[in-house]
Amino acid sequence: MASKLAESNRVRQQLILFQRNFPNKKAGAVLDGRDIGSVIFPDAKIKFFVTADLRVRAKRRKEQYEKIGQEYSVKDIANKLEERDRRDKNRKVSPLICMPDALVYDNSKGSFKRLKKEIIEIVEKKYKSLGLKIINKR
C-alpha cells in the first residue's frame, strides 16, 4: 500500500515536509524508509542501505503473516516483494536508490537483533568521531 501511495507526487510532497521536520522535535532520530537517505535527508551523517535476498525476505514475511494467522506461500510473497521493489526502483517520484555514501548491509544471513547491534556500533563510532553524544540507546 505505501509503495503504491508513494508513486503520487502530491502525497510525497506532503510527506517530505512532515518527515524532514520530525527529527527536529527530538535530539536526532533514526528514520527508516525507501527514500530517507536520497530525498528526505540526503545530507545525513550516516546512511544505511539494508538489503536481503528476495527468498529470505519472503520467508521472513511469511513468518510475520503466520504470527497474525494469515497464510500465504513463499512464492506468492516473493512475487509481491519483487513487484514492489520493481515499482519502487522505477517510480518517477522518490525512486528507491542506494546513495553512494550509504553503508550497504546485506542482512540475508543475519537476524534483526544482529543488524541492530552492528548498526548501533557503527553509529556510536561515527558520532564519537564527530564529537557528538548519543542520548538514548534502545
What are these regions (language model features)?
Residues 29, 45-49, 102-104:
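Short, well-ordered beta-strand core segments
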